[in-house]
Amino acid sequence: MSSAHKKINAWVWVAVVFAVCAVVYGVLSSYPRELAVYSDELRYLDVARSLWQGRGLRVRNMPSDYQKILYPLFILPALALKTTAAQITAIGWLNALYASSAVFPAYALCRATGQNRRRTVFLVGVVALLPTMSAASTFMSETVFLPLSLW
């Protein structure tokens, strides 16, 4: 088997790990929520909604100089859905996708640093099972910043 073929197979394996993680974390994030309690979640959702509606950066319908807009930009696709419940569920699934995508840069880092296959499997597995992945069940920017920090 050629080296290029082995690399393709390894990337397929990483893609399977990503898909499994995304489904598991997506299912775990699909529970009824009450947003009235968590101020960060409300702020992210308010900023995303104001951006979606073309009203600029607003928090509770008031102009804001809020600077943490990367995560609200990432949850914008969920706002295309009609009901708040559907939007919240979609955000949970988007978070699961974003957090699970950390396995790709983890694998690339292992390959770039010359780790052997056994260590690579271990390290990618650790990233896939990090307790930080539980952030996918909330509206937390960590779901976006974990994969970005690995790149």
Give the positions of each predicted feature.
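Short acidic/glycine- and proline-prone juxtamembrane loop motifs at membrane-interface regions
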Residues: 38-39, 64, 137-145
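Hydrophobic core segments of transmembrane alpha-helices in multi-pass, intramembrane catalytic enzymes
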Residues: 44, 99-103, 141-150
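Extracytoplasmic catalytic-loop and juxtamembrane helix elements of membrane-embedded
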Residues: 33-50
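Short, Lys/Arg-rich, polar N-terminal cytosolic tail immediately upstream
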Residues: 1-7
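Transmembrane-helix motifs of polytopic, lipid-linked glycan transferases
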Residues: 90-114, 151
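Short hydrophobic/aromatic helix or loop-helix immediately within or flanking a transmembrane segment
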Residues: 46-51, 62-84, 143
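Transmembrane-helix signature of polytopic, membrane-embedded enzymes
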Residues: 106-129, 147
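Transmembrane signal-anchor helices characteristic of membrane glycosylation enzymes that use polyprenol
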Residues: 9-38, 128-129
